[in-house]
Amino acid sequence: MSTIEERVKKIVAEQLGVKEEEVTNSASFVEDLGADSLDTVELVMALEEEFETEIPDEKAEKITTVQEAIDYIVAHQQ
């Protein structure tokens, strides 16, 4: 089983169409990985599905980097 970090990075790479090597923990979805607002919505939906969790809009807006996504998932795993 992959770690949460590996799974988040794989989803980010797939959703944003970038190489997994480009997906560093400090990478910003918009500035570093070229995501637009639709990409970020789709990314949040993919994370919710993968980790069987719900990310409220007000929380999703604050998740702007790969590490913030990892931290949120870790904190909200059952």
From Swiss-Prot:
This is Acyl carrier protein 1. InterPro entries: ACP, ACP-like_sf, PKS_PP-bd, PP-bd_ACP, Ppantetheine_attach_site. Signal peptide: none annotated. GO terms for molecular function: acyl binding; acyl carrier activity; phosphopantetheine binding. One of its GO terms (biological process) is lipid A biosynthetic process. 4'-phosphopantetheine is transferred from CoA to a specific serine of apo-ACP by AcpS. This modification is essential for activity because fatty acids are bound in thioester linkage to the sulfhydryl of the prosthetic group. It is found in: Cytoplasm. It comes from the Bacteria. It comes from Pseudomonas aeruginosa (strain ATCC 15692 / DSM 22644 / CIP 104116 / JCM 14847 / LMG 12228 / 1C / PRS 101 / PAO1). GO terms for cellular component: cytosol; membrane. The modification O-(pantetheine 4'-phosphoryl)serine is found at S37. Carrier of the growing fatty acid chain in fatty acid biosynthesis.
